Curated annotation (Swiss-Prot):
Cofactor(s) the record lists: Zn(2+)
Protein name per its UniProtKB record: Formamidopyrimidine-DNA glycosylase
Alphabetized HAMAP family for the sequence: Fapy_DNA_glycosyl
Organism of this sequence: Rhodospirillum centenum (strain ATCC 51521 / SW)
Keywords attached to this entry: DNA damage, DNA repair, DNA-binding, Glycosidase, Hydrolase, Lyase, Metal-binding, Multifunctional enzyme, Zinc, Zinc-finger
């Protein structure tokens, strides 16, 4: 599933192309994804101007102007396999898993606009369209925790949110009400960099441990964004290119390999271990992470 770095990468790629552009044509090829699409979705989008693109947690938020309803927000969640790819028009025939295609007006001095295609093989993504005034109260956004790259996320705030939690720290960090946007890959990588075991009880991650974990999270996310995210299965950037952060994984997907943090001997120690927590694979070094 695309996590914060992948969604942020897509946001930046789309922003460079479609910010300020008008949606002149919108083609919708099915009535639903994970949930039903909004009523009159394509008709309501057509003719609106893209005023800006933002991200909250794993959600892409597109601000639209020009509607009789007032400013609108188009919320996009990519689910497990959703992609948004932009290219020069005109649009061709839709592929078997292309569910929404929109075309913009041409940028100044150019003959063709941009065509953006939403493709989703598993159809686990979803979209919504609602008045901007309802943004903070939207059910998908209202209870989210702080942004890990924002000014409101520091060791003190993380310690406060983890206080009293007796779940493993891995599960706590995946809780979107604790911190927004983290997923399995980046939690594994962040805990490794901080030297914290994913089995450790969340409430014990305070003080110096929280002081190590917060910059580790920030560094992992920042580096992943710079690399265009991680392409393991379906994810591609908005230009159709793969992300490259998967080549920088220290522990994720590296079961049985030597730990880059302690150079342990896999024959003697087993190297990087894989365990299952809450139904998800966790990768870590039991010797390096405590």
């Amino acid at each position: 599933m695309p996590e914060l770095p992948e969604v942020e990468t897509v946001r930046r790629g789309l922003e460079m192309k479609i910010a300020g552009r008008v949606l002149v044509r919108v083609a919708q090829y099915r009535p639903d994804l994970r949930f039903p699409l909004p009523e009159r979705f394509a008709a309501r989008l057509t003719g609106l101007r893209v005023a800006g693109l933002f991200r909250r947690a794993k959600y892409l938020l597109i601000r639209l102007e020009g509607s009789a309803e007032g400013p609108l927000v188009w919320l996009v969640h990519l689910g497990m396999s959703g992609t948004l790819v932009v290219r020069r028009g005109p649009p061709g025939p839709p592929g078997p898993h292309d569910h929404l295609v929109f075309e913009t007006d041409p940028p100044p001095g150019e003959a063709q606009g941009w065509v953006v295609t939403y493709n989703d093989v598993r159809r686990f993504g979803f979209m919504d369209l609602f008045p901007e005034a309802l943004l903070d109260s939207h059910p998908m956004l209202a209870c989210l925790g702080p942004e890990p790259l924002g000014n409101g996320f520091d060791a003190e705030e993380l310690s406060r949110r983890l206080a009293g939690k007796i779940t493993p720290i891995k599960a706590a960090l995946l809780d979107q009400t604790v911190v927004a946007g983290l997923g399995n890959i980046y939690v594994c990588e962040s805990l490794f960099r901080a030297g914290i075991s994913p089995r450790r009880l969340a409430h014990t991650v305070a003080g110096r441990r929280a002081g190590r974990l917060v910059p580790a999270i920030r560094d992992v996310l920042t580096e992943a964004i710079a690399a265009g995210g991680s392409s393991l299965r379906d994810y591609v950037q908005s230009d159709g290119e793969l992300g490259y952060f998967q080549h920088s994984f220290k522990v994720y997907g590296r079961e049985g390999e030597p730990c880059p943090g302690c150079d342990c001997d896999p024959v003697r120690t087993g190297g990087i271990a894989r365990i299952v927590q809450s139904g998800r694979s966790t990768f870590y070094c039991p010797r390096h992470q405590r």
